[in-house]
Amino acid sequence: VCFIVRHHMYDLNNTAKDKTLRRTFARWGFERSLEIADIREADVHGSGIITGEVESAARWRILLQKMQQEGVPFSARALNCSGADIMNWLSLPASPAVGKIKAALLAHCAVYPADNTPARLKKLACDMLHRDTQDENRL
């Protein structure tokens, strides 16, 4: 219930870019994203302002269907790598950094689902670590 209350007003004006929606939906998961679309539609209809199709809910459903057809991972578990893989690839100990990298990989694959392969995820993870290291050296 808290999740629904917190997110049912997300992108109320239907102005979020598809890339932004993809990343958000991957973070929320497929079922929860559909549920929020349903709640959005019910909320708008309940207000009496619109009786027909609710543009944002319809757009979300279409995008979610497309994402599902493309094989977008809707959870960190659906990525074709594990935290252990990331630790091995990057010679990292178990730490919050591993989870941060995995979350970034999920966001990336929400937009570029074809990159959800072990080889591509390894390269992306290495690039992320290298970029973070460069950023730390600038401080």
Stretches with model-predicted labels:
Residues 47-139:
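Charged substrate- and nucleic-acid-binding regions of tRNA-handling and nucleotidyl-transfer enzymes
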Residues 1-54, 72:
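Histidine/acidic-rich helix-loop-helix segments that form or flank divalent-metal centers
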